[in-house]
Amino acid sequence: MIRKTSVLRSNFIGIYAKAWDDVAFITMMADEKTVADFQEVLQVDVRRISIDNSSLIGTMMVMNSNGLIVPYGSEITGLGDLDGRNVLQLKDKINAIGNDIIANDHGAIIHKNFSNRSRKEIEDTLGVETIRTTIGNILTVGSAGILTSKGMLVNPETDDDELEFLRDFFKVSVKSGTANFGSIYVGASIVANSKGVLVGKDTTPIEMDRIDDVLS
């Protein structure tokens, strides 16, 4: 299932929310209709949270089935039970965790400037191998792609060799494309898990077909 929605009247819904196959988190300020969209499409428990009183929770967290990572010293409200996941408050000069890490249960790509210590902590928390690289020449890899346990959409600057590498590394189908009427920052424009996909309201029918094809 794929559906258009907005969060706080923004079509860049990925900066306000994060999802996996068993739970989704959304800004505390989201309205009831938006939360209902997330519940119906993603088919998971949707929890309103805040991180350091910010609504931009999608930029500040990453998770897979094994773990969840937020910036060091974060005050989190509404997180609830995480079903045995490892939880890491990562101490690094890079603190936009959701923008700078993209992961599933097979691997994680991280920003090139993470320290060696941080890289080891990320691997231990998420239970996967990590690689420091870019996606389509974008350093903020979490904003350059959207990844689930079934598929991955990356920005259109990603070349064929890179697409093949991503397929092998994450063990999912991978395609390039845009959302929100041509935005290359698909991670900021989409929230998805293996059950459904939410996209910003500016996303065109052609974009939706491509997104649905690779993620649904």
From Swiss-Prot:
Pfam families: eIF-6. Keywords: Initiation factor, Protein biosynthesis. GO terms for biological process: cytosolic ribosome assembly. The keyword Phosphoprotein does not apply. InterPro entries: eIF6 (IPR002769). One of its GO terms (molecular function) is ribosome binding. Binds to the 50S ribosomal subunit and prevents its association with the 30S ribosomal subunit to form the 70S initiation complex. PANTHER family: TRANSLATION INITIATION FACTOR 6. Belongs to the eIF-6 family. This is Translation initiation factor 6. The lineage of its organism: Archaea, Methanobacteriati, Thermoplasmatota, Thermoplasmata, Thermoplasmatales. The gene is eif6.
